[in-house]
């Protein structure tokens, strides 16, 4: 910030002293009805907010840049700046300017940052807004990471033994701000992912102070009560979070929920790369919303339910027991349309109880926040009724009945699930709070507390009296006038008012100069009249003139008392918010399953996987169910690694993703898009799909691909599920084949356990491993050819594809005809040696211990040398000569029968003992 070169006024001296305490924040300085910014802050704010930049100074040679915004609109402008990543310090007037002497006292009342905002304008309704803290361990490879959603009070932490995994988790949780110790240098990619780093002094990460902060915030005496005993890195990170929160909120964080250390041994681990590749939260182009898995699954009715859905998508279970509890609850709503509909209608009246409670607890709740909370509490009885009342709309069709499984606690689909029973045991209708808010607040209160008009009549006797004065003051004055007229007998007694004397009685001098009663006090003499007051009139005048201010002051006090009372109920509110979130989550999964005719999957502890008529939920939602081709897929002890081949655009990537997504959905407790499914639990889900590069870090597409693949090979366990798509692109063909081959070898060895892999490739050389390497099998996406055109059938069939049809796809994409024709000629020339090349590669790189058939002279030919021409079958020549358009249906049938006989009689045909290898190569997916 530039230093002023003029003699500063007391106001600017005060401004500069406050600015010195918040050098990294834009200081909004309250002056009357505006918040003003000066110097560099003003120039930046004017540019970002597109408001007028002016100046303020008595010295024209040293103008002070200045801009300002009205106090009543400050939240809108602050929200824009926070959304752009700026820190904002709000400096308010902390005393009444009317009663102050000299400079009005001002102080910073809050600091708003991207990771600590509470205003709805800066928050996504159904997504968390995380503040993160990372603490590296004494061992360079260790570290702890904690994250906190200030708006809800939820916070968690995790530690890792490897920095790479730690940073993967940071990128996965994507905090708006990340607190790190001074001098710590994170990976460059973190800076490119939109994560703002905030460097704090090392003292904020001190273990002793951090432990004291955390234990005090949670109200416990030992770290073991929080699962943090011996986990110093997480404790330090949590301490830094609390210190930063106290600094920005100007108070200790009393609204935090119990800390949850995330036990990864109980969760399906999905890293940030896999989330992106599966388009769980964002599409590959980075956009959210339509086209993502979350968008398909989100039938939640409340913000809390939406955020729980987000949590479960990030951290599904890997244990059968909690999954089945969710499945039972989901199915209970799935089969009962009437109950589910009633619950959805009731939940529609529930607002964001978590965030409302937080704002109220931190003294930032507006009157309208209280109304939203009141309406939410008022909806709880309707929610409860929807859960307990019997319904008659149960629909159980054979295709919707759950797969019989010993892992379920239900017998007939009607029994109340255990999870719901336990939920209802802790149900708190909060009738006392609902009645209090209902009796206290008007339905449409003003947005600002100090404006008054917040409370209903009957809530407070003194307030009612002041309201009566404010609303009926004129009537009281007229009643007093009438009483005095009657008492004094002066029928023409008048009541008047001026700014000098206030209210007065006026008596005509000519008519009543000698009849004025003794209790009249003379205030003013005029030529034709006398003006008087009385003690009663003075008292009434004082009450009338002060009633408005007294009413506003009393309402402010009453509102603060009400706020404190509701803040004291924050644990009850948070508990009910969690119950509502779970109900909403269950009904949302049931609604999605019902609308799309999904099934309940069976769960196993082995590595098997069987999916019947599986579909990709997002693709199906985009193109319509009628246009989506479902597929069966199976993995078992003999089929662990699937080599998937087929043309471009045939749907290989869709098949890969849909298998992974079905496993993910199952471990969330959701129904799955299939006719039936039995799935072995997965501990880690890995995906390497699609092309990407990172030019900012000098990383090519191939480099990024290899880095992600290396991570998968290092971190995968025997219970993981891996989907790999087109490994080895971006380099020479031989390099790509060699790398892909070696990876298949490595994964095949691990597949002797329970590791499951789907490997899509255009390197058809790899398909030779089927039958030669245990666990490896091939499948392909079928197509149909007719008159030189290809039709994508999108059907998964056994065996390898014979070619990739890349030239045909290029033609469909609009590549000019001459280029396509030339490509066909070159391809035909290359393919003459294709079979020879494939066998030569297999012979050259066969795995130790794998017995390959002995190769004859033809198989020893160079890889790209064409094979000698073979004699054509007579049927081929007949096929060339025929004119199909000239044949009648009967002639065509006769011709086909003749060809069949000729084919069977020709030596060397499949029916006459053609070699098994050639017969296998003849089986492709085109029809």
Swiss-Prot record:
Pfam assignment, any one: MutS_I
Regions of compositional bias (Basic and acidic residues) in chain numbering: 915-927
Matching Gene3D superfamilies: 1.10.1420.10, 6.10.140.430, DNA repair protein MutS, domain I, MutS, connector domain, P-loop containing nucleotide triphosphate hydrolases
GO MF annotation list: ATP binding; ATP-dependent DNA damage sensor activity; damaged DNA binding; mismatched DNA binding
Keyword Membrane appears in the UniProt entry: no
Cellular-component GO terms for this entry: cytosol
GO biological process: mismatch repair
PROSITE patterns: DNA_MISMATCH_REPAIR_2
Annotated binding of ATP, by residue: 646-653
InterPro entries attached to this UniProt entry: DNA_mismatch_repair_MutS, DNA_mismatch_repair_MutS-lik_N, DNA_mismatch_repair_MutS/MSH, DNA_mismatch_repair_MutS_C, DNA_mismatch_repair_MutS_clamp, DNA_mismatch_repair_MutS_core, DNA_mismatch_repair_MutS_N, DNA_mismatch_repair_MutS_sf
Keywords for this protein: ATP-binding, DNA damage, DNA repair, DNA-binding, Nucleotide-binding
Positions of disulphide bridges: none
Region (Disordered): 904-927
Record carries keyword Lipoprotein: no
Physiological role: This protein is involved in the repair of mismatches in DNA. It is possible that it carries out the mismatch recognition step. This protein has a weak ATPase activity.
Family indicated by similarity: Belongs to the DNA mismatch repair MutS family.
HAMAP family associated with the record: MutS (MF_00096)
Protein name: DNA mismatch repair protein MutS
């Amino acid at each position: 910030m530039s230093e002023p070169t003029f003699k500063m006024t007391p106001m600017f001296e005060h401004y500069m002293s406050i600015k010195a305490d918040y050098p990294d924040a834009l200081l909004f300085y309250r002056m009357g009805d505006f918040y003003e910014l000066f110097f560099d802050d003003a120039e930046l704010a004017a540019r970002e907010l597109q408001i007028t930049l002016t100046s303020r100074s008595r010295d024209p040679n040293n103008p002070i840049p200045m801009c300002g915004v009205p106090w009543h609109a400050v939240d809108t402008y602050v929200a824009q700046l926070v959304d752009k990543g700026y820190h904002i310090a709000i400096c308010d007037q902390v005393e009444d300017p009317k009663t102050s002497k000299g400079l009005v006292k001002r102080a910073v009342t809050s600091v708003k940052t991207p990771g600590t905002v509470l205003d709805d304008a800066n928050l996504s309704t159904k997504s968390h807004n995380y503040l993160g803290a990372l603490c590296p361990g004494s061992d360079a490879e260790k570290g702890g990471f904690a994250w906190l959603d200030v708006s809800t009070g939820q916070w968690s932490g995790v530690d890792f033994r490897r920095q790479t995994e730690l940073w993967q988790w940071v990128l996965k949780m994507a905090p708006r701000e990340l607190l790190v110790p001074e001098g710590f240098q994170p990976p460059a990619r973190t800076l490119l992912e939109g994560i703002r780093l905030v460097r704090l002094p090392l003292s904020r990460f001190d273990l002793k102070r951090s432990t004291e902060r955390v234990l005090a915030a949670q109200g416990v005496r030992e770290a073991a009560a929080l699962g943090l005993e011996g986990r110093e890195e997480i404790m330090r990170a949590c301490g830094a979070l609390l210190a930063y929160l106290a600094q920005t909120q100007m108070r200790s964080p009393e609204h935090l929920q119990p800390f949850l250390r995330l036990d990864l041994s109980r969760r399906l681990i999905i890293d940030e790369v896999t989330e992106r590749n599966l388009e769980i939260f964002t599409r590959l182009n980075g956009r959210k919303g339509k086209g993502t898995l979350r968008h398909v699954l989100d039938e939640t009715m409340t913000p809390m339910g939406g955020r729980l859905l987000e949590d479960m998508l990030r951290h599904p279970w890997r244990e059968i027991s909690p999954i089945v509890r969710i499945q039972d609850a989901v199915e209970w709503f799935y089969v009962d349309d009437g109950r589910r509909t009633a619950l959805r209608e009731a939940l529609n009246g529930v607002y964001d109880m978590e965030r409302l409670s937080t704002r109220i607890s931190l003294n930032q709740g507006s009157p309208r926040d209280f109304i939203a909370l009141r309406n939410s509490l008022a909806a709880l009885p309707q929610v409860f009724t929807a859960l307990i009342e019997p319904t008659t709309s149960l629909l159980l069709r054979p295709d919707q009945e759950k797969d019989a499984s010993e892992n379920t606690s239900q017998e007939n689909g009607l029994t109340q699930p255990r999870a719901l029973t336990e939920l209802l045991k802790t149900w708190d209708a909060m009738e006392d709070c609902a009645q209090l808010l209902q009796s206290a607040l008007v339905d449409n209160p003003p947005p600002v507390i100090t404006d008054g008009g917040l409370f209903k009549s009957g809530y407070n006797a003194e307030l009612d009296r002041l309201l009566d004065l404010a609303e009926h003051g004129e009537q009281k004055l007229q009643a007093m006038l009438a009483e005095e007229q009657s008492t004094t007998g002066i029928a023409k007694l008048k009541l008047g008012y001026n700014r000098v004397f206030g209210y007065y009685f006026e008596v005509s001098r000519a008519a009543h100069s000698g009849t004025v009663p003794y209790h009249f006090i003379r205030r003013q003499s005029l030529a034709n009249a006398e003006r008087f007051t009385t003690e009663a009139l003075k008292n009434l005048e004082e009450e009338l003139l002060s009633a408005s201010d007294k009413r506003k002051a009393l309402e402010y006090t009453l509102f603060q008392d009400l706020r404190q009372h509701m803040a004291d109920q924050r644990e009850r509110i948070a508990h009910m918010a969690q119950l509502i979130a779970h109900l909403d989550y269950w009904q949302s999964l049931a609604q999605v399953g019902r609308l799309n005719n999904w099934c309940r999957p069976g769960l196993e502890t082995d590595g098997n996987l069987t999916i019947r008529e599986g579909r990709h939920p997002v693709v199906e939602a985009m193109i319509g169910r009628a246009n989506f081709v479902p597929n069966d897929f199976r993995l078992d002890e003999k089929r662990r690694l699937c080599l998937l081949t087929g043309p471009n655009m045939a749907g290989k990537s869709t098949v890969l993703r849909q298998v992974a997504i079905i496993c993910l959905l199952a471990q969330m407790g959701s129904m799955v898009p299939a006719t039936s499914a039995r799935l072995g639990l997965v501990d880690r889900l890995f995906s390497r799909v699609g092309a990407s590069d990172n030019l900012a870090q000098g990383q090519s597409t191939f480099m990024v691909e290899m880095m992600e693949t290396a991570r998968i090979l290092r971190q995968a366990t025997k219970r993981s599920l891996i989907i790999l798509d087109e490994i080895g692109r971006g380099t020479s063909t031989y390099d790509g084949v060699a790398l892909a081959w070696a990876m298949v070898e490595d994964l095949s060895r691990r597949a002797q356990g329970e590791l499951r892999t789907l490997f899509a490739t255009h390197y058809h050389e790899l398909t030779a491993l089927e039958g030669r390497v245990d666990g490896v099998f091939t499948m392909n996406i079928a197509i149909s050819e007719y008159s030189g055109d290809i039709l994508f059938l999108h059907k998964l069939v056994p065996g390898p594809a014979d070619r990739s049809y890349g030239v045909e796809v290029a033609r469909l994409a609009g590549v000019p005809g001459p280029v396509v024709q030339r490509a066909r000629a070159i391809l035909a020339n290359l393919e003459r040696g294709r079979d020879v090349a494939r066998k030569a590669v297999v012979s050259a790189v066969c795995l130790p211990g794998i017995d390959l058939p002995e190769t004859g002279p033809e198989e020893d030919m160079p890889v790209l040398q064409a094979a000698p021409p073979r004699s054509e079958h007579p049927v081929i020549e007949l096929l060339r000569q025929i004119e199909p358009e000239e044949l009648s249906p009967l002639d065509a049938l006769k011709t086909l029968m003749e060809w069949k006989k000729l084919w069977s009689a020709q030596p060397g045909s499949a029916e006459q003992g053609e070699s098994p290898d050639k017969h296998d190569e003849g089986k492709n997916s085109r029809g």
